[in-house]
């Protein structure tokens, strides 16, 4: 683990995959438990802030960005409006694509901001669509040039398993939701870039690790938690091999 001072108010900590393993922390832990994230970040702060300039500051903030070898954790006190641009500037050499960077960073920031007020207490029956469960011959519930399907995953580990087998390209959008402690994968296929046979084969792969569901995309967008937005398969393939 390496520490670099960016300016008087910001330090960058480079955390490799080996560093995570030594601390018994995985990417899955960081994605699954916001208290685990907070505890891990403060333990890093305690380790690198030997002169206690940051730990004693109530306004300390964390921002995490993935790099090609692990994570970069930025710890700032008295953050300013220009902090984010400074972070992007110093991290650009090691960072993956902007889309990947934003997906992981935004998710971890959302997890840190979670409160108990996010708990869902509504009647489950109001969350369900009126349609029948999807099957491989009825995967098209999209409109126009897209075809959409929602798969209820057996567990989080199902996502990287699916990602390893489905060829990801610009013709598929994938969103991972969590709703009532169950993970759902929404796949949107662009019909101009995928043949009916390709879509059917990809869905067959997905259903090996999940089940059809009557929970609709609309329900997930309104009541669920977005875990990975737009490129869930790509992110899973990159970070959960």
From Swiss-Prot:
Signal sequence segment: none
Classification via Gene3D superfamilies: 3.30.70.1950
Location of the region described as Disordered in the Swiss-Prot/TrEMBL record: 115-141
Pfam families: MecA (PF05389)
InterPro entries, A to Z: MecA_C_sf, Neg-reg_MecA
Subunit structure: Homodimer.
Name by which UniProt lists this protein: Adapter protein MecA
Annotated organism of origin: Pediococcus pentosaceus (strain ATCC 25745 / CCUG 21536 / LMG 10740 / 183-1w)
Native organism taxonomy: Bacteria, Bacillati, Bacillota, Bacilli, Lactobacillales
């Amino acid at each position: 683990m390496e520490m670099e001072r960016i300016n008087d108010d910001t330090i960058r900590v480079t955390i490799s995959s080996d560093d995570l393993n030594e601390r018994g922390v995985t990417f899955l832990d960081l994605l699954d438990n916001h208290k685990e994230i907070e505890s891990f970040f403060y333990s890093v702060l305690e380790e690198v802030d030997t002169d206690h300039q940051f730990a004693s500051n109530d306004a300390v903030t964390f921002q995490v960005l993935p790099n090609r070898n692990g994570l970069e954790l930025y710890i700032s006190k008295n953050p300013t409006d220009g902090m984010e641009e400074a972070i992007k500037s110093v991290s650009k050499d090691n960072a993956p694509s902007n889309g990947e960077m934003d997906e992981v960073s935004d998710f971890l920031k959302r997890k840190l901001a979670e409160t108990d007020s996010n708990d869902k207490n509504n009647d489950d029956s109001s969350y369900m669509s009126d349609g029948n469960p999807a099957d491989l011959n009825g995967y098209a519930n999209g409109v126009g040039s897209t075809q959409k399907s929602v798969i209820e995953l057996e567990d989080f580990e199902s996502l990287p398993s699916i990602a390893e087998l489905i060829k990801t390209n610009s013709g598929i959008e994938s969103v991972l939701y969590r709703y009532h402690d169950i993970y759902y994968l929404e796949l949107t296929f662009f019909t101009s870039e995928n043949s009916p046979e390709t879509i059917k084969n990809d869905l067959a792969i997905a259903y090996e690790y999940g089940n059809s569901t009557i929970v609709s995309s609309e329900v997930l967008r309104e009541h669920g938690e977005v875990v990975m937005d737009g490129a869930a398969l790509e992110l899973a393939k990159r970070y959960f091999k």
